[in-house]
Amino acid sequence: MKIVILDGYAANPGDLDYHLLEQLGEVVVYPRTSDDEKVERAKDADIILLNKVQMDAETLAQLPNLKYIGIQATGFNVVDIKAAKKQGIIVTNIPAYSTDSVAQMTFALILAVTNRVEHYTQENRNDRWAYNKDFCYWDTPLMELAGKKLGIMGLGNIGMKVANIARQFGMDVCACTSKNSCDLPEWIQKVSKDGLLATSDILTLHCPLSDDTYHLINKENIEKMKDTAILVNTGRGPLVDEEAVAKALHDQKLGAYCADVMSQEPPSKENPLFKEPNAYLTPHIAWATFEARKRLNRQVAANVKAFLEGNPINVVNP
């Protein structure tokens, strides 16, 4: 059984091993694979594992030996799952491996804004505190989370983890979700999308990317938000219209934008968000803690093992 990993570096730059996979077959690892290389590298594989290498219908048609695609991530929009099913290829993902890490990054971004961490670190380096007349130095207000309203769009594993952390900060938590109110904890208020937009001091996105959620936050919806609102996106870049967000920041119609994801990755250096001082952007690292990648690595092998035993798990194209 030949197992080919097409873009192994992001999930495993060398601090993990593949011994669990190697017990299941011949493993070939490529750090990165371009569009021009993917067919040649995957043509003899029974199993391919990938993170962000695109597998569209045209590519899959050139891989008649392929039996299984293991996506080394939770999102599975990199694979045409309908075409894969038509071709008899099972596709699996890795749910919930990064829940704690992504929730942690969500609050790292929020606290970076509310506590002005970057600003005051730089001010210290510029000796502003050293030459200050008072025992402390601050020139711009900080914000306490207790009593503020956190709005959550998407109340899956990560959204619920974020909600629980917010509760510990003393925040009021509301959510726009398809879940019934009776299935939610009593301390989470279910509201409409417009209600969430209008009342949230901080709005955080944890939705999957789909036709319905593409540019969920656009010019029209930003106009419904508070001018001081903090928008957080650790879900998928295209959930927001980045041009509209950049303009809202520039026009002071949005307090801050915090994101670990962007519409194009790697992003263009011309992206207008890079010009906005109230845009706090990290390079898609929320999932990448050692602990989360270790869980990912183990679950990838578990998915492959289950497939080989005839009882596939975490299938996204049943």
Where are these regions (language model features)?
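Rossmann-like dinucleotide-binding domain for NAD(H)/NADP(H)
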Residues: 91, 172, 219, 228-318
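N-terminal Rossmann-fold NAD(P) dinucleotide-binding loop
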Residues: 159-160
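Short beta->alpha connector loops at strand-helix junctions that form conserved
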Residues: 31, 72-73, 89-100, 177
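Phosphate-binding beta-alpha-beta segment of Rossmann-like dinucleotide-binding domains, i.e.
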Residues: 87, 95-149, 316
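Glycine-rich Rossmann-fold phosphate-binding loop(s) that bind the pyrophosphate
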Residues: 155-156
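Rossmann-like adenosine-cofactor binding region
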Residues: 55-61, 179-272
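N-terminal glycine-/charge-rich "phosphate-binding" loop or analogous flexible N-terminal tail
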Residues: 1-45, 170-174
